[in-house]
């Protein structure tokens, strides 16, 4: 396949700004810097041709340059049409790394961008780094001839992991995969603490709304929902949760949140956030009962949670306030403010998670790529986890930056607990 464009970004002149942002982020990403210190000399990813499909942000740029420092060739696209930070994409392009991403892609351009990452100068991809499963699905359905040459997939997010397990159950998955999302240092940090900061950032930048005193409805009380609920409560909102899982619902109730259905909550809320990864969470009948100027947004991976199609087909008027902020006038006279067209609000309307928490997630990604590339015999076709020892190592790499001092087990204590002084400190089934 002939290579057409070395990169495609919004504006290559933003590269200098992007480079400054990368320099700042590196100081907040100790895990990735540790990976460079440990592996830059040995280059364990030498020979790997990694196709990446993950939000093209400043933090992702630091991940990309880490993979390259470890010996990999990389081609990149974003996993969301609104999530690219154009200065970050420009910096990566300027560094000579093929990247195909800009903020505000069409669905057709989005697919085109992913397809540009499949073929390298020395041959097709042989590793996948995915976020949400679009790249994984594309190769399995449209380019199955490439599957035999792919050594492994590392998947970043809950939605993509769900997709992998579904593929495996249906006998469709043809490549070994590591579930990065369920590393403790990913899901209990990125999903929880990342969303706790970036949700509010997105809502504030989009609307400048006062959150204190408002009623906020959070659909879903997984790790993402927990972070969102904490953030909204911290800013003074009264928070209502909707849930399908009795365990999560009980957790929410015991944290003091009201738990009810969307059919009831839609009449009370001023701000709505979907976090479920499921379809049909907020539908036409809910919009029709909402208060005037209710703010509706999503922080789950895909744009399937909010019925945006219903709004577009049934609203009397749609007014674009500014990029990714639309105000719909309904037939009943009430208005709905929709953020980021129902896609990820924290990346569509703000800058996504802070660098420090993304360092946790991306260090897991680097370790997963090294594992799959250097130990292919250990990972048959299926969905695997990183070992507990590596999870603990990711956490340990971030402690110094926060001036955390760990207590060290004595030999006597270690013998009493029946474990090594060096860990792992918890069994695999421990839930944290």
From Swiss-Prot:
One GO MF term attached to the UniProt entry: NAD binding
Cofactor entry: NAD(+)
Protein family: Belongs to the adenosylhomocysteinase family.
SUBUNIT field: Homotetramer. Interaction with AHCYL1.
Entry-annotated residues carrying Phosphoserine: 183
N-acetylserine: modified positions: 2
Catalytic activity: S-adenosyl-L-homocysteine + H2O = L-homocysteine + adenosine
Transcription regulation listed as a keyword: no
Coiled coil: none
This protein's GO CC annotations: cytosol; endoplasmic reticulum; melanosome; nucleus
InterPro entries: Adenosylhomocyst_ase-like_sf (IPR042172), Adenosylhomocysteinase-like (IPR000043), Ado_hCys_hydrolase_NAD-bd (IPR015878), NAD(P)-bd_dom_sf (IPR036291), S-Ado-L-homoCys_hydrolase_CS (IPR020082)
Top-level enzyme category: hydrolase
Binding site for substrate: 57, 131, 156, 186, 190
CDD domains noted in UniProt: SAHH
Superkingdom to which the source organism belongs: Eukaryota
Region (NAD binding): 183-350
Protein name: Adenosylhomocysteinase
Protein keywords: Acetylation, Copper, Cytoplasm, Endoplasmic reticulum, Hydrolase, Hydroxylation, NAD, Nucleus, One-carbon metabolism, Phosphoprotein
GO BP of this protein: one-carbon metabolic process; S-adenosylmethionine cycle
Known pathway: Amino-acid biosynthesis; L-homocysteine biosynthesis; L-homocysteine from S-adenosyl-L-homocysteine: step 1/1
Phosphotyrosine found at: 193
Residues where N6-(2-hydroxyisobutyryl)lysine is found: 186
Location relative to the cell: Cytoplasm; Melanosome; Nucleus; Endoplasmic reticulum
Predominant location category: cytoplasm
Cofactor note: Binds 1 NAD(+) per subunit.
């Amino acid at each position: 396949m002939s290579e057409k464009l070395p990169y495609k970004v919004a504006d290559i002149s933003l590269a200098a700004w992007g480079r400054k942002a990368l320099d700042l982020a590196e100081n907040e990403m100790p895990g990735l810097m540790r990976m460079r210190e440990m592996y830059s000399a040995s280059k364990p990813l030498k020979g790997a041709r990694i196709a990446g499909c993950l939000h093209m942000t400043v933090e992702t740029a630091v991940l990309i340059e880490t993979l390259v420092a470890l010996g990999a060739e990389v081609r990149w696209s974003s996993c969301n049409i609104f999530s690219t930070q154009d200065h970050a994409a420009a910096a990566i392009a300027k560094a000579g790394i093929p990247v195909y991403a800009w903020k505000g892609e069409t669905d057709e351009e989005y697919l085109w961008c992913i397809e540009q990452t499949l073929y390298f100068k020395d041959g097709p991809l042989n590793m996948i780094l995915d976020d949400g499963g679009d790249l994984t699905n594309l190769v399995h359905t449209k380019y199955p001839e490439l599957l035999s040459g792919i050594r492994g997939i590392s998947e970043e997010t809950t939605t993509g992991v769900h997709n992998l397990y579904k593929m495996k159950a249906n006998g469709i998955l043809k490549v070994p995969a590591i579930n990065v999302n369920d590393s403790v240092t990913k899901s209990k940090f990125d999903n929880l603490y990342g969303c706790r900061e970036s949700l509010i950032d997105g809502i504030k930048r989009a609307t400048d709304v006062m959150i204190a005193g408002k009623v906020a409805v959070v659909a879903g009380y997984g790790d993402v929902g927990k972070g969102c609920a904490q953030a909204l409560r911290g800013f003074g909102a009264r928070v209502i949760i909707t849930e399908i899982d009795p365990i999560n619902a009980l957790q929410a109730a015991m944290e003091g949140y009201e738990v009810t259905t969307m059919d009831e909550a839609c009449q009370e809320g001023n701000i709505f956030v979907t976090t479920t990864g499921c379809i049909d969470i907020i539908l036409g009948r809910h919009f029709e009962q909402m208060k005037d100027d209710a703010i509706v947004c999503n922080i789950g991976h895909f744009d399937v949670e909010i019925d945006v199609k219903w709004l577009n087909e049934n609203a009397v008027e749609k007014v674009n306030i500014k990029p990714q902020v639309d105000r719909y006038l309904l037939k009943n006279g009430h208005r709905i403010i929709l953020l980021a067209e129902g896609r990820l609000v924290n990346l569509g309307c703000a800058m996504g998670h802070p660098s420090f928490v993304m360092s946790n997630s991306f260090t897991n990604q680097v370790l997963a790529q090294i594992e799959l590339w250097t130990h292919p015999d250990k990972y048959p076709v299926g969905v695997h986890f990183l070992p507990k020892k590596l999870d603990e190592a990711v956490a340990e790499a971030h402690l110094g930056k926060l001036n955390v001092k760990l207590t060290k087990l004595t030999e006597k204590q270690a013998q009493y607990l029946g474990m090594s002084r060096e860990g792992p400190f918890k069994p695999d089934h421990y839930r944290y």
